[in-house]
Amino acid sequence: MEHTVKQNKTIACDVLVVGSGAAGMAAALKAASQGLSVIVAEKEQYFGGTTAISAGWAWVPGNRVGTAAGDTREEVETYLKNLAPDTYNADGVAQFLDTVPEALDFFERETDVEFVYPEKAPDYQMDLPGARLGGRAILPKDTDARILGDKRLLMQPYMSSYTVFGYMPQVGPDINEFFHVNQSVKSFVYVAKKLLRTWFDAARYRRPVLRSNGNALMTLMVKSAYDAGVRMWKSSPVLELTRGDDGAVTGAVTGGEHPARVEAKLGVILAAGGFSGNTELRKKYFPHDAAGDDHFTPTVGHGGDAATMTLAAGGRIDDAVSSVGSWAPVTVFRFRDGRQRLFPHLRAIGLPGLIAVDRHGKRFGNEALSYHDFGGRMIAHNAGEDKTFGWVIADEKTMHKYGIGYAKPWPMPRGYFYKMGYLVKGNTLEELADRIGVDAAGLTQTVAEFNVGARAGEDPAFGRGSTEYNHFRGDMEHKPNPNLAPLDKGPYYAAKIQMGDLGTFAGIAVDSDNLVVTEEGTPIPGLLAVGAAARSVFGGGYPGYGSHIGAALVFGYRAGRDVARLASARENGRGIGRPASASVAEEAAR
């Protein structure tokens, strides 16, 4: 079969994995553990993908600790059915839950990955049947980047938006100390120690060596991959899939630092993320971005490469989901030279003394919902408008304690943020409304009504602060409600929020073996898709902390486990365009 991209060098392997995030590395590690030859091709200059800049949680119900604490499969299924009832995928959920214990056992027993099992990490919709306060979401243990030796600088750095002077706080007690750094001597000392260690390491090693959150997970997975003999290629985009005369995918053509024609005997596993960075696909699938200029993604490498390669190979995009993306409202800092820096508001709008309003000065939802659910409210509320946006509003007390996005709390200076238009200030609500183009009467009425309930620890309009998950997104030391405080002390502040994401839930259509399927539903031999590249097993719902990573680890593991079996099971027991090797056949028979 003729291909459009020519490379002189041919390199053979059993499995080619495209992408080095959680899904790709899970597939690579499991495949390598079976004696298979694996290449991981990452188009970015660093390994780790979006997972490496994330909080690193993994939503994996049915894990040993949660099960021992009383969580049941029936409860999980009930919760997921209620989360996205019209798009519930019973078979996919069954595969996910069947595999969770096996996958976690593999990572903890056969790789360097270690997990922490927090007692409390509420599901995102605690008001739904089957939701639980904990036992389903886990996170990786911190690690030292020096375990990678001279390869430690090949890992994706932290996203600056998520760090405080280079340190990335963890959800829970750690981040709460940072919230109270200017209110408590204990918190100040705690934060000072963390920052001094971070700065010392950065000066000595060029980067902080303590890795936490998703960066710790990816550091441990990449270390394990090197130890297992996986060939790790950075800055090596896959330019094109190659196919045999029978239509089976036989490998790919790569460019960048490793230009080659890669012959993958058993298959290609697409784990290159979603398509939120692809303007044309956003215009087609994102409900708020028909013009392609009204969405701001902080993801790494989610340019739709896997989706476009799949479409070229005869596959399709499955958008039969309740939400095509995992929404995450952001504030956008714009530099004079046109560059942008995004701050994803994954927690902060749920803090007491902050509200979000529309162009009419009206609130449009419970700001302490998950970023995904609040983002969905924001998109729906702006339907029919030319742009999707809102404003985060705070008074002086709240700004002093918590700040907004990049504009940090006292004693950090704010002048630069005023100058660049990121933060707007008004001595009164009317003055602030005038400066941001919001209806002044609407804003003053909204704040007055909100304040009445907030003083009593209630939100009659939207029920903010009414669930344990809401409280988890607030300030647990604030009374009477961790999510509510009146806005009653000028001056007042505003920052514009727009729509971002953490990945896509619509994605490549796959069958029960993660094989990519055509419009007719026929599997394409030798081509698998996992992680954010594939349609979400949760049907567009966002069940809890780490929903992307949990599914990525589990289905990446399944793809790596099954790729040899799938190749061996083809007609006449052949691999992709050639007989499977003896070792492959033996492994598939085990």
Swiss-Prot record:
Catalytic function, reaction form: 4-oxocyclohex-2-ene-1-carboxylate + NAD(+) = 4-oxocyclohexa-2,5-diene-1-carboxylate + NADH + H(+)
Cofactor: FAD
One BP term from GO: steroid metabolic process
Keyword Oxidoreductase set for record: yes
Induction summary: Induced by CHCA, trans-4-hydroxyCHCA and 4-oxoCHCA but not by 4-hydroxybenzoate (4-HBA).
Single GO term (MF): steroid dehydrogenase activity, acting on the CH-CH group of donors
Listed InterPro entries: FAD-dep_OxRdtase_2_FAD-bd (IPR003953), FAD-oxidoreductase_2 (IPR050315), FAD/NAD-bd_sf (IPR036188), Succ_DH/fumarate_Rdtase_cat_sf (IPR027477)
Enzyme class of the recorded protein, top EC level: oxidoreductase
Keyword terms: FAD, Flavoprotein, Oxidoreductase
The keyword Flavoprotein is assigned to this record: yes
EC number(s) on file: 1.17.3.-
Family named by the database record: Belongs to the FAD-dependent oxidoreductase 2 family.
Subunit composition and interactions: Forms multimers.
Role this protein plays: Desaturase involved in a cyclohexanecarboxylate (CHCA) degradation pathway. Probably catalyzes the conversion of 4-oxocyclohexenecarboxylate to 4-oxocyclohex-2,5-dienecarboxylate, which is spontaneously isomerized to 4-hydroxybenzoate (4-HBA).
Protein name: 4-oxocyclohex-2-ene-1-carboxylate 5-dehydrogenase
Organism: Sinomonas cyclohexanicum
Upper lineage: Bacteria, Bacillati, Actinomycetota, Actinomycetes, Micrococcales
